[in-house]
Amino acid sequence: MRVVVATGNAGKVREIAEALSELGWQLEGLNGLTLPEETGTTYEENAALKACAAALAKGLPALADDSGLEVAALDGQPGVYSARFGNRPNDTERNLYLLEKLRGVQDRRAKFVSVVMLAYPDGHVETYRGELTGTLLEGPRGENGFGYDPLFVPDGETRTLAEMTVAEKRTISHRGRALAALLATHRNGPPPRETVRTE
């Protein structure tokens, strides 16, 4: 099956391709297609905006995800606004802004959430959700990964996501869990309609 990956991030296309390799799908990028702005207030809405637009424009199934970091002490912020948190221009600045917001805060619990959506040109969608709980440090550690990875230690681990290899991170990450649910659903062929899975 040919599937469009609705992202401009080549690294994300590779990550998805590796996670779903056993399905034998032919994954392709956007090839110049511009996606709509993420205006949703939930991960599901933002993933749907991208996946449905790509599926309609390309006439093929399309896969998109939206993800974010939810911090308990900040009432779930930054959430769907994680990539734009504090209007900071890059990951380093967003991490510094988050640390400032958490200065003196004892409750450092947080979770990463990812919603992966597979949309078809006929309007059918499948939704898969993955979560990873953990704790935020008071300063960054590690050089791998991106986003808030240098601050986030998953429950049961001593290293941040940025201190793990890509392969290690993929096995436990929120996106990895959502993609694993999609893989499990499609392993034996297309699933029944109205599929929603959570791992």
From Swiss-Prot:
Molecular-function GO term, any one: metal ion binding
Documented EC number(s): 3.6.1.66
Cofactor field: Mg(2+)
Function comment: Pyrophosphatase that catalyzes the hydrolysis of nucleoside triphosphates to their monophosphate derivatives, with a high preference for the non-canonical purine nucleotides XTP (xanthosine triphosphate), dITP (deoxyinosine triphosphate) and ITP. Seems to function as a house-cleaning enzyme that removes non-canonical purine nucleotides from the nucleotide pool, thus preventing their incorporation into DNA/RNA and avoiding chromosomal lesions.
SUBUNIT field: Homodimer.
Xref: PANTHER family: INOSINE TRIPHOSPHATE PYROPHOSPHATASE (PTHR11067:SF9), INOSINE TRIPHOSPHATE PYROPHOSPHATASE/HAM1 PROTEIN (PTHR11067)
Protein name: dITP/XTP pyrophosphatase
Species of provenance: Deinococcus geothermalis (strain DSM 11300 / CIP 105573 / AG-3a)
Taxonomic path: Bacteria, Thermotogati, Deinococcota, Deinococci, Deinococcales
